[in-house]
Structure formats: C-alpha cells, structure tokens
C-alpha cells in the first residue's frame, strides 16, 4: 500500500497523485480533493486498493449476473437494484415469503391485475383488454394508493398471473363499469372460473339465490358476489382470488374485505356478507355442501387437512405402554399394540380395534425422553406416570429404584433410589398382588375404566410373544400368573435376595412377581397416598441387566435394603425372564 491509512495527515497533491494514480497513469488529483481530510469519501474513493477491490468484487455479491439474463437498459441501473427485482432467485425468495401470508390489500392486488391486463391483454384478447385496463385503472383511483412493488411479485397461486388474465380482468371490469350487463351472463363468469367442475357458478344445494335474482339486481357487481364467494370456498385458493378480483372494483369495500378475510375458511364470511349484500340467504354451513370441494389450506383455519384426532383424545398402548419410538415391525415378539394391560384396555376404552398397528399413533418415531417425559423408561413398564408418592416417601409397596438408568436417561431426572417407609407386614402378603385397580384420581386412561368386563389382562411376555389373556378379577389373574412363574429354579433365585428366605414357595414368588410386574397398588383406600402410584417400581430394579446400569446384584441389594429393610420378598421379577432380557438387550431397549 503506497498511501497512508485513513487516519494519517493530509498529503500533498503530488504524493496523492502518485499514490492513488498508480504511477502517473492518471492525472494528479485536484488540490480541492487533496485538501479534504483523509477520511472523506472522495479521497477514500481515489485510493488504489479500494478501487481495485471495487472492480474485482463488482459481481461477486450476486449469484446470477444480470447481463447474462437480459440486455442492460439504457438508463444506468446498478446491478444490485436490477438483480433484486428480476433475478429468478429474488422471485423465488418473494414467492416463498408470500406463501403463508394473508392476501395483500385490494389496492395492490388491483394494481397487479391492471399490470397483467396491460401486459397480457393485447396478446390474448385485444378487443377486451382496453376496457379491462381502463376500468382497473379507474378502480385504482377509487381505492387510493398503488404500490409499484407489487407488479413484480410473483404469486403462484393467484390466477391473476396465469394465462387467462385478460378474460378475468375484463370480466371484473365489466362488472364495475356496466352495472348489470356482465352479471346477467353467467356463462361469461363460468368461463374464467377455474374449478368449474367442482364449483358451479350457482350453488347446487337449493339456495334461494337464483340467476334471475342476481342478474336483475341494480347493483349487478354485488349481485353475483354470493356465488363467487361460494365458489371461492369450494374451489380453494383459485376461486378465492377470482372472487376478490370480482368484488374489488366496487366502491363499497365491505364485501371485498369480508371475502378477503374468509379466503379459505368456510363460513367465516357468511354473516357479515349477508348483512352487506342482503342476497346471501344460505347458511355458511351450506357452503361445503354437495358439489363443493372442502377448502384445504394448511395456512388458514378451516377443515383439518391432517387426520389427527384432537389433542384431548388419548392414544392407545403403543404410546402409553411401549413407546412409539419402538415400532412393532422391529419388535415382532413385543408388539406394542398388544402391550397387555395398557394396550388391550386402553384401545378398548378408546374404541380402537385391539390389533391396531402402533403406527396409528401420531407419535411414531418420536424420541421418548423428549416428548413422553413423564413415562417410565423401563421397556417392560405399563406406562404409568411417576406418582407423587414416589418422591414424597409415602407408603408405596415397592419404593426402590424403578428406573435403573436414573437421571441420565430420563428427562424427568428422578433420584436413583426413591425413599420409602418400611412396609407393614400386611403389605408383604400376596394380597398386595390381589388388590384390584381402584378408581384412580390421577390416571384417567382407558385401562383404569371400571366398567370394563375384563379389566385385568396378563402382561407376561415370553419369547413367543405377549400372553394378553384377560380376567375379570385380580385373583384369577394371579392364579393364571402362577402358571407363568412356576419355574423349577424359582426358589433358588429367591434365595439370592436378602430377606427372601421367608418365602419358600413358588406361590409366594408368583405373588411377589405379580405385585411387581403388574404394578398393582397396595391394598389401601383409593384416595390414600399409597394408591397414588399406579406403577409401583420394583424394589431391586437395579439388579436386572441394563446396558447403562452401573450396579448389578451385589450393589443393588446394598442400595435397596437400607431404605426398605422388609421389602425383600419384592424381588425383581426380571430375574425369572431370561429370554426377555436377551431379546431386550439385543433390541437396544434403554
């Protein structure tokens, strides 16, 4: 750099000329320029590096060079202005930015319509383009300002930019200029209406509005407006644009504003427009009657396009029981749609078919920690939420580490071992497994409904699939579970657990397994804190295999026994499920 930076002292004309002129190729800068301060824009523009950089970076800021697209106009237009309006990239950006927006005000739309009529009318329909442009210009004067930027805005869904502009515009212009002549020719209107098959110009559902009443009306421009708004609602966006073009040349802006507000919503404009024109005598609900296509627009509140049930409807067991993140095509033996107590009864309670695939839930593929924060991360859990009794230390029957992953895997972040009171001896008997599901204040799901004929279903999952047998009482379910749990090595397995020596029979093992596995609440009153948790976590949950668990049988007993010294009989039922543990770890359950 031969010249000094901007903050230096002023230079003489000779040094300035030699520094910025590149060795005398240019004449020296005049003294008036050189006497300016160095930070002045005139002197900065004469510096050699800035001039070279301007030359080199003249077109690097543009993705498309405009001179390759079209010849430059005679007036000196900077490439930035030229590129900002005309390049395909800019048009695409304009189009994308206008997709979800409401329609522009009537003046700007009429401006674009007039531009389209001037441009395309001579090619298509020379005889009719002149009155169209003239009346559109007159309507522009009526409605006030005319923003020039709207001419270049490309609206892909607006029929004003399509091929039939001249006919559409002349139709709307004749509506405004000659009061009743154009509305008395319904064939002309039907000609420029695009969804003519699904949207006839006159409503087919027995409305009292007839051709004679609308054509003989003195304000013919408003006489045809109910049919256009009908057609707009039936035909979606295209009919709506035509309706606005037909209504906007009128001096009274109320129907235009009303129809613009009700673009894709059936019945939103019915009441106000009946007050404005007095001829729209059909109810708004009849707008989507026979012969009309219901307006589907994802941007405006109308009929729902997506077949999702409302948010007040619960979903069946594929969410609550077995996490929609684990779809059944990967888990053929553990089908979430048949997830035992939850799957069968929740689907039955909600009126869903029992074998409905889990993909019917809108959460299929959702990650369980982010969306289903309150659900248990145990893949064998019935899907109840953690009750307040887990954290409050009340008398839940098996309050130990229900979630072996702990806060690292659960978004809820519960402590690893829940505090609990020492249990009463009665709670250790098999009556804990026989307690029927009470009417629960916290769980209003389908499997808690008391009017079900068979409210208890077996949730045993073997290698061949879930059992899913249903029983009327918990005693029958318990006796059925004894057939599952009567394994030859059950007593040896029980001997490994602290405090389990008192249970010397497989029946007691089945009782404990049923109490833990089915998560039945202890035999307390329905409103008591002990029954607040439908999902009572198993005591030695840390002892089962878990890919992220840091402690297994040895440390698990040490963790659970101090908090629950008498809870030994409530061993982990997963020690009996050898084939399930192998399949669960192979399937990547967390």
Curated annotation (Swiss-Prot):
Question: Where are the residues of the annotated region Disordered?
Answer: 1-43, 96-293, 341-366
Q: Where is the composition biased (Basic and acidic residues)?
A: 241-251
Q: Which domain of life is it from?
A: Eukaryota
Instruction: List the biased-composition ranges (Low complexity).
Output: 27-37, 128-139, 171-189, 207-219
Q: Quote the tissue specificity entry.
A: Expressed in mammary epithelium.
Primary location recorded for the protein, binned into one broad class: nucleus
Q: Which Pfam families match?
A: nlz1 (PF12402)
UniProt subcellular location: Nucleus; Cytoplasm
Output compositional bias ranges, type Gly residues: 260-273, 341-352
> Which InterPro entries does this one have?
Elbow/Noc_ZnFinger (IPR051520), Tscrpt_rep_NocA-like (IPR022129), Znf_C2H2_type (IPR013087)
What induces or represses expression of this protein, per its UniProt record?
A: Up-regulated by 17-beta-estradiol.
Signal peptide feature range: none
The entry's linked illness reads: Luminal B breast cancers are the clinically more aggressive estrogen receptor-positive tumors. Amplification of a distal 8p12 locus occurs in around one third of the cases and ZNF703 is the single gene within the minimal amplicon. Amplification of the gene correlates with its protein expression in tumor cells. ZNF703 is a classical breast cancer oncogene since it is able to transform non-malignant cells and increase cellular proliferation.
What's its job? Transcriptional corepressor which does not bind directly to DNA and may regulate transcription through recruitment of histone deacetylases to gene promoters. Regulates cell adhesion, migration and proliferation. May be required for segmental gene expression during hindbrain development.
Q: Enumerate the PANTHER family for this protein.
A: ZINC FINGER PROTEIN 703, ZINC-FINGER PROTEIN NOLZ1-RELATED
Q: Subunit comment for this entry? A: Interacts with TLE4; increases transcriptional repression. Interacts with DCAF7 and PHB2. May interact with HSPD1.
Name the record gives this protein: Zinc finger protein 703
Q: What organism is this sequence from?
A: Homo sapiens
Identify the gene encoding this protein. ZNF703
């Amino acid at each position: 750099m031969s010249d000094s930076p901007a903050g230096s002292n002023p230079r003489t004309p000779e040094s300035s000329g030699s520094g910025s002129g590149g060795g005398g190729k240019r004449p020296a800068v005049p003294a008036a320029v050189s006497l300016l301060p160095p930070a002045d824009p005139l002197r900065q523009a004469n510096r050699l590096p800035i001039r070279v950089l301007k030359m080199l970076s003249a077109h690097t800021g543009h993705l498309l060079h405009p001179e390759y697209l079209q010849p430059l106009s005679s007036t000196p237009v900077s490439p930035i202005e030229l590129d900002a309006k005309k390049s395909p990239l800019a048009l695409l950006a304009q189009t994308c930015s206008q997709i979800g927006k409401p329609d522009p005000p009537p003046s700007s739309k009429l401006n674009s319509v007039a531009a389209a009529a001037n441009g395309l009318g001579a090619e298509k329909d020379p005889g009719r383009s002149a009155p169209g442009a003239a009346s559109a210009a007159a309507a522009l004067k009526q409605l006030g300002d005319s923003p020039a930027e709207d001419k270049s805005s490309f609206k892909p869904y607006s029929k004003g930019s399509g091929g039939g502009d001249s006919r559409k515009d002349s139709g709307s212009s004749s509506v405004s200029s000659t009061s009743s002549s154009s509305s008395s020719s319904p064939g002309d209107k039907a000609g420029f209406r695009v969804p003519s098959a699904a949207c006839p110009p006159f409503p087919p559902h027995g409305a009292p509005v007839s051709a004679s009443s609308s054509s003989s009306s003195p304000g013919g421009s408003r006489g045809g407006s109910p049919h256009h708004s009908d057609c707009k609602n039936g035909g979606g966006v295209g009919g709506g644009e035509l309706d606005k073009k037909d209504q906007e040349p009128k001096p009274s802006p109320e129907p235009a504003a009303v129809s613009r507000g009700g673009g894709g919503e059936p019945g939103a404009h019915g009441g106000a427009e009946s007050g404005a024109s007095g001829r729209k005598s059909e109810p708004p609900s009849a707008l989507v009657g026979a012969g009309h296509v219901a307006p589907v627009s994802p941007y405006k509140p109308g009929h729902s396009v997506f077949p999702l049930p409302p948010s007040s409807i619960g979903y069946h067991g594929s969410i609550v029981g077995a996490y929609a993140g684990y779809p059944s095509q990967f888990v053929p033996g553990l089908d979430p749609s048949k997830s035992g107590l939850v799957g069968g009864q929740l689907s039955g309670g909600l009126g869903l078919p029992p074998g409905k695939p889990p993909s019917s839930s809108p959460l299929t593929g959702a990650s369980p920690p982010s969306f289903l924060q309150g659900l248990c991360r145990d893949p064998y859990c019935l899907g109840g939420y953690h009750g307040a009794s887990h954290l409050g230390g009340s008398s839940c029957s098996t309050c130990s580490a229900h979630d072996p992953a702990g806060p690292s895997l659960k978004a809820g972040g519960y402590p690893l071992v829940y505090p609990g009171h020492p249990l009463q001896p009665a709670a250790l008997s098999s009556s804990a497994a026989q307690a029927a599901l009470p009417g629960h204040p916290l769980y209003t799901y389908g499997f808690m409904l008391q009017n079900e004929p068979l409210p208890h279903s077996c949730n045993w999952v073997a290698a061949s699939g879930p059992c899913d047998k249903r029983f009327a009482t918990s005693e029958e379910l318990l006796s059925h579970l004894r057939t599952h749990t009567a394994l030859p090595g059950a007593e040896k397995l029980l001997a490994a657990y602290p405090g389990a020596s008192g249970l010397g029979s497989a029946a007691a093992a089945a009782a404990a397994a049923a109490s833990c596995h089915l998560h039945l609440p202890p035999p307390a009153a329905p409103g008591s804190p002990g029954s607040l948790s439908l999902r009572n976590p198993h005591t030695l949950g840390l002892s089962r295999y878990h890919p992220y668990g840091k402690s297994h049988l040895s440390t698990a007993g040490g963790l659970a026994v101090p908090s629950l010294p008498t809870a030994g009989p409530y061993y982990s039922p997963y020690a009996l499920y050898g084939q399930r543990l192998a399949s669960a770890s192979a399937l990547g359950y967390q």
